[in-house]
Amino acid sequence: TALALTAAGALWCSARAVGVLAGADSGPVWSIPGTLFGGDTGSMDGLSALFVVIISVGAVAAVLYSRGYLAHCLAEKSPAHISLHYTALVAMFYAMLGVVLSDGGFSFLFFWELMTVASFLLILFDAQRREVRRAALSYLIMMHIGFVLLVIGFVRLDAACGAATFGALGDYFRTQPGLPLLLVFLAGFGMKAGLFAICLLYTSPS
């Protein structure tokens, strides 16, 4: 099931991405009329299309590889445990797609949080080990510190420009002092990217 869901999404998104890379107009991927930050859309341009292809290929490869990698765990873990792991893996794939396709802050933050929760569940695969539980909890705390910083950044952007979209960032930096917002976003994204050593202290070994 995980392979089918991942492959279906990968094929559909990759086909659309190849069209965009070839010069076709993809149109909106989604459009939400009213959210916390106003209207919100998702779209695919050349850069996001490239990332969609990379994510899709990587996700299908990860699911295929996991079948052999987890084979020895089938006798040790319950079917529900294995199902939860694959659910998190599929959710991670679609969350990453959502992140690169989001134009607005609301949808971006939604998929960013989904990516965090999915990663948390994946880290917890060997939850019977104390060090794994500690790593997962540390990861969750650090990611939510970063999430709060991103929310602050988008709220500031919305207050200054009337829109919390990536397109509004250009207007903001042309009309407002840019360094404070830049530092907030850098810290928020840096938590996920592992720019700070404390983010990787416990999670990387697990």
Tell me the role of every PLM-derived stretch.
Residues 1-87, 160-171:
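Transmembrane helix-loop-helix hairpins at membrane boundaries of multipass inner-membrane proteins
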Residues 34-37, 93-95, 103, 181-183:
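Short hydrophobic "helix-edge" motifs at membrane interfaces and signal-peptide entry regions
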Residues 42-45, 56, 101, 110, ...:
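Short conserved micro-motifs on helix faces and helix-strand junctions that flank
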Residues 50-55, 107-115, 178-186:
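Structural signature of hydrophobic alpha-helical transmembrane segments
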Residues 65, 69, 118-123, 190-201:
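Juxtamembrane interface elements at the cytosolic ends of transmembrane helices
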Residues 84-91, 95-177, 191:
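Alpha-helical multi-pass transmembrane bundles of energy-transducing inner-membrane proteins
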Residues 202-206:
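Conserved small/polar residues in nucleotide/adenosyl-binding loops
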